[in-house]
Amino acid sequence: VAERDRLREQFYAIKAKAAGEGFFRRGKEQELYLNEANDLLYSILSQVKIKYPENSRASTLIKSMLEANPRAGACEEIIKLVQEALTSNGGKLNKTAKAKLIEAGFSIEEGGSHYKIVFHDSRYMFTVAKTPSEYREGKNLLSNIRNVVDVERKI
C-alpha cells in the first residue's frame, strides 16, 4: 500500500510539473500517505482565510487555491480509524484494534509489557501498554497521536 501511494504521488508530481502547475516546492520530506501535503496546506489556508477581509485580494487568492486543490480527507479517515481502535477497549489493543491501526498505516511491534506502534516512520512512534492501567489511556494515546499525525488539526 505504501509503495502504491508513493508511486501515485510521484505520478501526480510529474504530471503537475509537466503542466506547469504547483505554487510551492515540496522539499525533501516525502508524504507518508497520498495527498498529505495537499491536506495540510488546505487546512492551513482554510484557517488563515478567515483572518482576511472577505473582499481582500488575499482572501480571493486563498479561495481560488482552495477551489483548485480540494481537500482529499485521507488524514480524517486515518484519525477515525485510530479513534475506533483506541477508544473501544479503553486503549487495550485486541485483534480488531490492531487491524484498524494497521489499516490506518501503523506497524505494531510487540516487546515486553508494551507495544510500539509506528506511523510509517520511526520518528512517529508511540508506546502502548499491553494492559492499560486506567480507562483514559486510550484517549490519552489518541490525543498524542493526533498532536503528531493530524495534519488537519486546528492551528
Which ranges hold each PLM region?
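Heptad-repeat positions
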Residues: 1-25
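Long mid-to-C-terminal scaffolding/interaction modules that assemble large complexes
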Residues: 68-155
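Interdomain/boundary linker segments immediately adjacent to catalytic/signaling cores
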Residues: 39-78
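Proline-directed phosphorylation-rich, low-complexity intrinsically disordered regulatory regions
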Residues: 22-39, 43
